[in-house]
Design a protein with these regions (language model features):
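N-terminal signal peptide c-region/cleavage motif recognized by signal peptidases
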Residues: 38-40
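Axial heme c-ligation environment in periplasmic c-type cytochrome domains
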Residues: 225-231, 251-280, 286, 290-293
C-alpha cells in the first residue's frame, strides 16, 4: 500500500501518502493534471434536421471542415464589439435546402429563431456563418453571470446588405431544422384572411415573425420558451398606450428597469418607424382575435 490511514482533526480518517512515495505521488498528480488540460473542455454537437439530409456535427469535425476559415465580425450583436471566429458558411451545411424552404434555429435556452432559407444560402453580400467555439480557445462570457455565445453561434458578415435583425443571430445554437412555414404550423397567429398581403397588418405579421417570434408566443402559438405570450391573457396593446408600447420596444429599460431584464431594444436601424407602426398594428389587430382556452 502506498500510504496509511491517520485520524483527521474532525475524527474522520484521511489518507496520507507514505513519505518515501511522495515523489511518485506528486508525479502522478502532475501527469493527471497535464492529461486533463490536454482534453477538450466539452464535446458539443449540432443537430441538423433537414429531412433526408439530417446530420449531427461534433465540434471537432466542424473545426476541421473543408470550408472553415477565420472571419471578423464587426459590431457583433451579442458581444457589442468586433469579434473574430473560426466559422463555416451556413450554406455549406444546408445540404438539400432550397431558397424557398423555411428553417428554425433552436438555442439551448429555448430561443427559437424562425428564418427563411434564402438569406442563409447567400454566398455574397449578407452571409451567414456558423461560428464554432474551440474548447482550447474559449470565447469570452456574454456577461459576468452568463456563459459564452458558444458552442455554436450563427453570425453574419455584412448584415446591413439584407437588413438582418438581431433575432437572426441566435447563439448557443443546438439544432437547425427544416419546418413548414410559420403560417402553416401556427394558424392562430394569422390575421384576418380577408386582409390583402400589402395591408399594414399583414406586413406587421411578417415583422412579428422576424423580430418577435424567436422569444414570444402569441395565442399560445409558437415554439419559443423564452418570453411571455403576447396575446394571452392580454396583448401589450391592452395595457400600454401605442406611444408607450413603441417606446418600450425601442428601449425596454427606459420604462421598466430591472437587473435580469433580457429583452433587447430595437433601434431605428433594425426596425424603422414605419415598420414599428405596422408591428403595433398587427398586435392591436390580434388582440381582437384571441384564441379561447
Amino acid at each position: 500500500m502506498n500510504g496509511s490511514l491517520s485520524p483527521s482533526c474532525a475524527g474522520v480518517p484521511t489518507f496520507t501518502a507514505h513519505p518515501r512515495h511522495d515523489g511518485h505521488y506528486v508525479k502522478a498528480l502532475t501527469l493527471l493534471g497535464a492529461l486533463l488540460l490536454s482534453t477538450p473542455l466539452f464535446a458539443a454537437q449540432l443537430t441538423l434536421e433537414l429531412g433526408a439530409q439530417s446530420h449531427t456535427w461534433q465540434t471537432e469535425a466542424l473545426l476541421k471542415h473543408s470550408e472553415v476559415k477565420t472571419i471578423t465580425v464587426s459590431n457583433d450583436v451579442s458581444y457589442k464589439r468586433t469579434m473574430t471566429y473560426r466559422a463555416v458558411p451556413v450554406a455549406a451545411l444546408l445540404t438539400g435546402i432550397k431558397s424557398d424552404d423555411h428553417l428554425q434555429a433552436v438555442a439551448l435556452d429555448g430561443f427559437a429563431a424562425e428564418m427563411p432559407a434564402a438569406p442563409l444560402l447567400n454566398t455574397e453580400g449578407a452571409q451567414a456563418w456558423l461560428a464554432i467555439e474551440d474548447p482550447a480557445k474559449p470565447w469570452p462570457r456574454l456577461s459576468a453571470d452568463k456563459p459564452s455565445a458558444g458552442p455554436f453561434y450563427l453570425v453574419w458578415t455584412h448584415p446591413e446588405a439584407a437588413n438582418i435583425s438581431p433575432e437572426q443571430w441566435p447563439f448557443q445554437v443546438s439544432s437547425i431544422k427544416r419546418l413548414a412555414p410559420v403560417a402553416e404550423r401556427f394558424p392562430a397567429l394569422l390575421p384576418d384572411p380577408a386582409l390583402k398581403a400589402d395591408d399594414p397588418v399583414s406586413q406587421g405579421f411578417a415583422l412579428f415573425q422576424k423580430n418577435c417570434l424567436a422569444c414570444h408566443r402569441l395565442n399560445g402559438a409558437g415554439d419559443a420558451q423564452f418570453g411571455p405570450d403576447l396575446n394571452i391573457p392580454f396583448s401589450p396593446t391592452e395595457y400600454f398606450g401605442a406611444d408607450f408600447l413603441k417606446r418600450y420596444i425601442r428601449d425596454p429599460q427606459s420604462l421598466r428597469h430591472w437587473p435580469q431584464a433580457k429583452m433587447p431594444g430595437f433601434s431605428e436601424a433594425v426596425l424603422p418607424a414605419g415598420d414599428l407602426d405596422k408591428l403595433v398594428e398587427y398586435l392591436t389587430h390580434m388582440a381582437g382575435r384571441k384564441v379561447k382556452r
